Structure formats: structure tokens, C-alpha cells
Amino acid sequence: GSIVQPPLQRLKSIDQWQSVATQIRALPEVNVVSPAANGSALVVRGNASRAITVVGVEPELYFRIVPMPEKIVHGTARITINDILIGTELANDLGVSVGDKLRVTSASGSANTLSVTGIFDLGNKAANARTTMMALRSAQSLLGLQGGVSALDVTVHDVYGAELVAHRITKLTGVEADSWIKTNEQFFTAIS
């Protein structure tokens, strides 16, 4: 039950995302609102390069939605500004382990060298090959989203009320909200 998001063609930040997040957080049905900067990038190690999906998050919020620490098989789920978490497939593919450095470059031309602090298993081969996770600030600068976010990940208390909440959020903020079914809770993403 992992979330695999379609790659965004062009990244634009949600307008006034801080105030949108505050409005969503104020809804009694809402449990967690986690800002994210997600996009496509290339990871380079020696002469090997792979296409990846970058998920930039604030761990103290995002880990309440997706319990990454439980999915770590090597290392820890630490994400500071210089860290990256990668999946088991990508790690095997590139021959990297915890402590190794990876160069990540994006379509916008930005590049960053990050240390692998943790290797995770999302229970899905494709996700383990493509998904990488880093600090929100690292992803923002890499993806050319300075100070912006491409998504707000939201969980609600009541699984069955999620569609309704998504609809309310769209009406309230003008931000489109999509529902995702995830394991036993409803999880959705608001995108601009």
C-alpha cells in the first residue's frame, strides 16, 4: 500500500501554500498536513545514472503519514539538509550503501551531493528503484521550487469521510485535492 505519484510535468508551487496548509489544518476532520516538494531527477554514481522521483518532506510531519523509520532496512530515517534515503533496488543497482555520497541533478540544472543515511523497502520493486526521499529544503532548491511546495499530503481521521474533506478543501482553498487509498487510512494530496 505505498503511494506512487505520477510525475509532474512542470513543477509549480501551490499558491500561498502556507496559508492553504493552515486552512486545511484547521478542519476538524484533518489529522496531518505535510508539505512536499516532489519531482523527477537523475541520480549519478560514478558513470551510472538513474531516473528517480524526489520526495522532499518535513520528516516530523511526513513520517506521521508514512512511517518511514519502520521501512528502513539499513541505516536510519534521518533526513537533514545533506541526507538522502533511497530504496533497496536503487541501492543494489548503483552499488551504494549507507554513508556513500550520491549526486542528484534535476531538469532545472540544479545539482546536489547528498549522503545516503538510510535504505528503505516500500514493499514494491518499482518504488524501491525510483523513490528517493530528502529534506524539503534540499528538494526545493534541487527542483527550483525555492520556498514552494508541489503538494500538501493530508490524512484524515475518518477513512470514509476523505472524499468529502477533499471536496471541502477544494471549495475552501481552490486547490485541487485527490484521494488516494492507502492501507487502512485515506490519504490524499492537494496539488495546484
Predicted feature locations:
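Hydrophobic, regular-secondary-structure patches
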Residues: 1-51
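Solvent-exposed, non-transmembrane alpha-helical starts
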Residues: 8-15, 44-46, 62-67, 80-81, ...
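Short amphipathic alpha-helices in soluble, non-transmembrane regions
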Residues: 20, 24, 68, 165-172
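Mechanotransmission and gating elements of multispan inner-membrane complexes involved in transport
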Residues: 107-192
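Hydrophobic secondary-structure segments that place a key small or acidic residue at a functional site
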Residues: 36-39, 48-57, 73-137
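Structural motif
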Residues: 28-31, 94, 147, 173
